[in-house]
Amino acid sequence: MTKKEIEKNYKKLLDQNLNLDLTRGQPSKEQLKLSEPMDQILKNKFNFDGEDLRNYGLIKGLDSTRKLGAILLGINYKNVIANGTSSLNLTSMVIQALFFKGINGEAWKHYKKISFLCPVPGYDRHFSLLEMMGINMINVPLRGDGPDMDYAEKLVKKDKSIKGIICVPKHSNPTGETYSLKVLERLARLPKKASKDFMTVSYTHLTLPTNREV
């Protein structure tokens, strides 16, 4: 299909004035009701870790929450930030910090071109965020067990404008596939093959134990 044909088909879709809700993962009303008792769990006990939970929180989050995260991640709690429930907001904060402050190099705003590897199919809101920041997106196809790492490694070796990869290793959105251990190991080593300020943005939700397991 030519570019002209694609643009023609795209215009046909626009002309339909569709208003579709493509949001995924929204809980049903029945599921939302399950969390209602949590509203009363504090029972007027608002002090924790020496902080009044009704007031503005600490920038890095409560120490107790960070220590719990450290246990789950197997790292020092000082390397954990507990901040809100929106991973997309956190990703935006990280990318903006890299743009204006940088890490292991210059601030990204000083580079003529910044690129990110994007496993596809992928999460549309990740792509929208990168597009908004003016970041060039390079597609890396998913293969059923994660992205094509041969291709990803080849790209980062030859193109130093590539400063990161954004991915969802567990139940990837929208395909649902989970990256294999082999792919995860190569993904972890990717920064060593890339530019010194390469950043891996990994959306991974941890499987917490159930009450029965506890």
Model-derived features with residue positions:
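N-terminal "arm"/small-domain region of PLP-dependent enzymes with the aminotransferase-like
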Residues: 1-71
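Feature marks short, surface-exposed loop/turn motifs that line or immediately flank catalytic pockets
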Residues: 26-29, 171, 210
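Short, internal active-site loops enriched in acidic
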Residues: 26-28, 86, 206
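Conserved core of the PLP fold type I
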Residues: 51-197, 201
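Conserved small/polar residues in nucleotide/adenosyl-binding loops
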Residues: 204-210
